[in-house]
Amino acid sequence: MARRLLLSFLLPLLLLASPALRAAGLSVGLAADVSSLDPHYLNAAPNIAVASHFFETLVAVDKDGQLVPGLAQSWQAINPTTWEFKLRPGVKFHDGSPLTAEDVAFSLDRPASLTQSPGPFTGFTRAISGKKVVDAHTLRLTTAQPYGPLPLDLASIFIVSKKAAAQATTEDFNSGKALVGTGPFRLVKFRRGEAVELARFDGYWGEKPAWDTLTLRILPADAARLAALLAGQVDMIEGVPGTDVARLKKDARFRL
């Protein structure tokens, strides 16, 4: 996975210490806290950004805002109220089990079950009135009336393992017990309010990440985040303080 894609969740202003390009591991200072690793619990940008390293969606959105294949290699409206999605073959979860249409159907149902969510994802699944698993790699979704934006909505719902998450709570995701996705990284450890530690998933179906490990340090204070970069404690930060941009542009150690 290219560096730009891997870190696409970060804000436009980035500083990267040059040696990090050659390192086996990358450490990033985040500007916002991550409240949960449950991908269906809270519809908030910091949580979604981190979840995107572990989980993927049926449909993706490219840098130009166009819909492109994700876990679904194709989709089509077979009548005004029915959409058919064909899953990408050969995709594995972090536990080695294959991705199936049953996992997708379960994942689309799950947001509605999280009744205590402070920011639910149900707005992206509300239009779906029915689901039919045709075979292991084919899922049909029906809507009560014609609904063209459905593929775009599905770009916001992460797919989880039904086996791992069927009886799981949000805390089971935070502990790592239920955190089984298809993404390029797997969870090593979540230290709430401090850091998220990740390791490359070698069974990933797509382009492999450039680094073996990724550490996301939670550093909401601008001064602390910048100090960590200058001290070599992190390789990259998001949210570079505007007052420091001009000075840092002149520092050959970093790229802005």
Name every feature range the model reports, one short phrase each.
Residues 8-17:
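Bacterial N-terminal signal peptides
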Residues 24-33, 73, 82-85, 104-108, ...:
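Short, well-ordered beta-strand elements
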Residues 26, 104, 137-139, 146, ...:
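Alpha-to-beta junction loops
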Residues 29-79, 109, 178-181:
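N-terminal lobe/hinge region of extracytoplasmic solute-binding protein
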Residues 66, 155-209, 213, 223, ...:
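Gly/Pro-rich hinge or "lid" segments in bacterial periplasmic/extracellular proteins
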Residues 74-117, 140, 225-228:
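Aromatic- and charge-enriched surface segment that lines or borders ligand/interaction sites
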Residues 76, 122-165:
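Surface-exposed binding/hinge segments that line
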Residues 131, 188-199, 215-256:
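Extracellular/periplasmic solute-recognition and catalytic clefts
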